[in-house]
């Protein structure tokens, strides 16, 4: 049997637009023959899904799932083309199953895609292909993450359409004593509202810090004040910046007189990590063109 290399799989995917798992299976079934693999994909009806894979998918839902003992959690973003499909029961049921699979996998899109499908038929990747064919829209498992703690992992979904699914999802991992579930949920709600860039100042992206410092330095120099004064201005403005983007430094939304860090200390809790997904974040949505839309409707009439 021919060796199925990553290069062969990549070549077939570029020719057909098929998913990674489908392309690999096609090559295995056809002993590495590209032409036969292409025909195999067409025969299996996967070309229909492949054609739809070029369409922008920026809607959908974010799902969170916790383990029974509350010590681990998974968060998944599954995209579709329209909000209408995201409210489809098939889509939601499948996403719930994918979130369960994510809880058992290693927290990467690749691992979850290759995991067993919740309906028992093939992989999660196969399940998504079947949904594309059934519902008629492109869908993408965009991102996946997992958190674990010796204490507790809490979850929150903002404006949930069904329990555990919404357009914003947050996981928070805490260690310590006290009511970690309650503290974690409150901090998760805070994160959903404020979108911090990092848990602590030390964890901020150095490039982001340097960029902000350059901007603030230029602004301060425009004041024409002495260097000593400018230096103090920069320090003060950087502290304000940290309060805006660092979770531990932010005023706690449920009690603005204290920071999130102070709230957690009062609760006897230590933040081990957080994940915050906002649906479609960073995905460019296709702009509707009215003229093209009318032309398409006229052509189909």
UniProtKB/Swiss-Prot annotation:
Xref: PANTHER family: ELONGATION FACTOR TS, ELONGATION FACTOR TS, MITOCHONDRIAL
Keyword annotations from UniProtKB, A to Z: Cytoplasm, Elongation factor, Protein biosynthesis
Superkingdom assignment: Bacteria
Cellular localization per UniProt: Cytoplasm
Originating species: Hyphomonas neptunium (strain ATCC 15444)
Location of the region described as Involved in Mg(2+) ion dislocation from EF-Tu in the Swiss-Prot/TrEMBL record: 82-85
SUPFAM superfamilies xref list: Elongation factor Ts (EF-Ts), dimerisation domain, UBA-like
Pfam families: EF_TS
GO molecular function, one term: translation elongation factor activity
Role noted for this protein: Associates with the EF-Tu.GDP complex and induces the exchange of GDP to GTP. It remains bound to the aminoacyl-tRNA.EF-Tu.GTP complex up to the GTP hydrolysis stage on the ribosome.
InterPro entries the UniProt entry points to: EF-Ts_dimer_sf (IPR036402), Transl_elong_EFTs/EF1B (IPR001816), Transl_elong_EFTs/EF1B_dimer (IPR014039), Transl_elong_Ts_CS (IPR018101), UBA-like_sf (IPR009060)
Protein name: Elongation factor Ts
Similarity comment text for this entry: Belongs to the EF-Ts family.
Origin organism lineage: Bacteria, Pseudomonadati, Pseudomonadota, Alphaproteobacteria, Hyphomonadales
HAMAP family named among the record's database cross-references: EF_Ts (MF_00050)
A GO-annotated cellular component: cytoplasm
Gene field: tsf
């Amino acid at each position: 049997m021919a060796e199925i290399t990553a290069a062969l799989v990549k070549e077939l995917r570029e020719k057909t637009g098929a998913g990674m798992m489908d392309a690999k299976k096609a090559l295995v079934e056809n002993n590495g023959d590209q032409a036969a693999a292409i025909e195999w994909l067409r025969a299996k009806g996967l070309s229909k899904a492949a054609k739809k894979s070029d369409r922008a998918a920026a809607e959908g839902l974010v799902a969170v799932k916790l383990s029974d003992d509350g010590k681990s959690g998974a968060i998944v973003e599954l995209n579709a083309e329209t909000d209408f499909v995201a409210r489809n029961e098939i889509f939601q049921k499948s996403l719930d199953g994918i979130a369960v699979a994510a809880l058992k996998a290693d927290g990467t899109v690749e691992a979850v895609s290759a995991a067993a499908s919740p309906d028992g038929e093939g992989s999660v990747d196969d399940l998504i292909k079947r949904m594309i064919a059934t519902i008629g829209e492109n869908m993408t498992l965009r991102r996946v993450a997992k958190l674990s703690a010796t204490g507790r992992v809490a979850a929150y979904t903002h404006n949930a359409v069904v329990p555990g699914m919404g357009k914003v999802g947050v996981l928070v991992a805490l260690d310590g004593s006290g009511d970690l579930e309650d503290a974690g949920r409150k901090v998760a709600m805070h994160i959903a509202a404020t979108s911090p860039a990092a848990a602590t100042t030390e964890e901020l992206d150095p490039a982001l810090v340097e960029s902000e410092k350059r901007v603030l330095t230029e602004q301060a120099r425009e004041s024409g004040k002495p260097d000593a004064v400018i230096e103090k201005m920069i320090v003060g403005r950087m502290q304000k910046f940290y309060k805006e983007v660092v979770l531990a430094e932010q005023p706690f939304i449920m009690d603005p007189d204290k920071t999130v860090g102070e709230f957690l200390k009062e609760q006897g809790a230590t933040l081990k990590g957080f994940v915050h997904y906002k649906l479609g974040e960073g995905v460019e949505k296709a702009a509707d063109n009215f003229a093209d839309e009318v032309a398409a409707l006229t052509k189909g009439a």
